[in-house]
Amino acid sequence: GPSSCKADEEPCEYHADCCNCCLSGICAPSTNWILPGCSTSSFFKI
């Protein structure tokens, strides 16, 4: 859940590291209204 996510803009390697681990390797804010905690941009790793 979100409680286990790193803060936004923190480095990430896997999707589990943060709510949205994007291809840049940085945690991003949640941007998906339908699936909170998921981003509409690509994950670095699922």
UniProtKB/Swiss-Prot annotation:
Residue(s) carrying 4-hydroxyproline: P2, P11, P29
UniProt keyword annotations, A-Z: Bromination, D-amino acid, Disulfide bond, Hydroxylation, Ion channel impairing toxin, Neurotoxin, Secreted, Toxin, Voltage-gated sodium channel impairing toxin
Tissue-specific expression: Expressed by the venom duct.
Pfam family, one: Toxin_19
One Gene Ontology cellular component annotation held by this UniProt entry: extracellular region
D-phenylalanine found at: F44
A GO molecular function held by the record: sodium channel regulator activity
InterPro entries cross-referenced by the UniProt entry: Conotoxin-I_CS, Toxin_19
Primary residence: secreted
Residues modified to 6'-bromotryptophan: W33
Top-rank lineage group of the source organism: Eukaryota
Disulfide-bond pairs as recorded: C5-C19, C12-C22, C18-C27, C21-C38
Location(s) in or outside the cell: Secreted
Keyword set includes Nucleotide-binding: no
Domain characteristics, as noted in the entry: The cysteine framework is XI (C-C-CC-CC-C-C).
Biological role: Iota-conotoxins bind to voltage-gated sodium channels (Nav) and act as agonists by shifting the voltage-dependence of activation to more hyperpolarized levels. Produces general excitatory symptoms.
Family: Belongs to the conotoxin I1 superfamily.
Protein name: Iota-conotoxin-like Fi11.8
